[in-house]
Curated annotation (Swiss-Prot):
The gene is Mrps10. Belongs to the universal ribosomal protein uS10 family. Component of the mitochondrial ribosome small subunit (28S) which comprises a 12S rRNA and about 30 distinct proteins. GO terms for biological process: mitochondrial translation. This is Small ribosomal subunit protein uS10m.
Length: 160
């Protein structure tokens, strides 16, 4: 890289421009009917920020996305202040877990993998993610033809 001064601005001019190689394959890409991403956190501000980031990334890739907020889960622990005595003196702790569910519909496998890798690499601290993929598959050959066409003629005559 070479720095070129241009009216007190530095412009990055690349010397050797090499194009990235694009690989193609003959295998058909997997199709997903739905991609469900459940994001969990304890801090609402972090969760709101991450939801905004994930929705913005999906819109940039042209993916349709829906977001809904399941009810939060609150776990409470009641402990004695003292280990051995004073049963009346207790302390309560609680953990509030907030959830966001991101629903992506009708994706190709390559788009889904690129999107998931991007949002997983930018996952903030204290945030957990669960991904559920619903794949579209072709119907097997033994199920395609109706059952009554595979029954032999002898069984049909004996029932009549």
């Amino acid at each position: 890289m070479k720095w070129v001064p241009l009216s007190n601005l530095h412009v990055d001019v690349p010397k050797d421009v090499t194009r990235p190689t694009i690989t193609t394959s003959d295998e058909p890409d997997t199709l997903y009917k739905r991609l469900s991403i459940l994001v969990k956190a304890h801090d609402r501000a972090v969760l709101d920020s991450y939801e905004y980031f994930a929705v913005l990334a999906a819109k940039e890739l042209g993916i349709s996305i829906k977001v809904h907020e399941p009810p939060r889960k609150i776990e409470r622990f009641t402990l004695l202040k003292s280990v051995h005595i004073f049963k009346k003196h207790r302390v309560q702790y609680e953990m509030r877990t907030l959830y966001r569910c991101l629903e992506l519909k009708h994706l190709t496998g390559s788009t889904a993998s690129v999107y998931l890798e991007y949002i997983q690499r930018n996952l903030p601290e204290g945030v957990a993610m669960e991904v559920t993929k619903t794949q579209i598959q072709q119907l097997p050959e033994h199920i395609k033809e109706p059952m009554w066409e595979t029954v032999p003629e002898e069984k049909k005559e004996s029932k009549s």
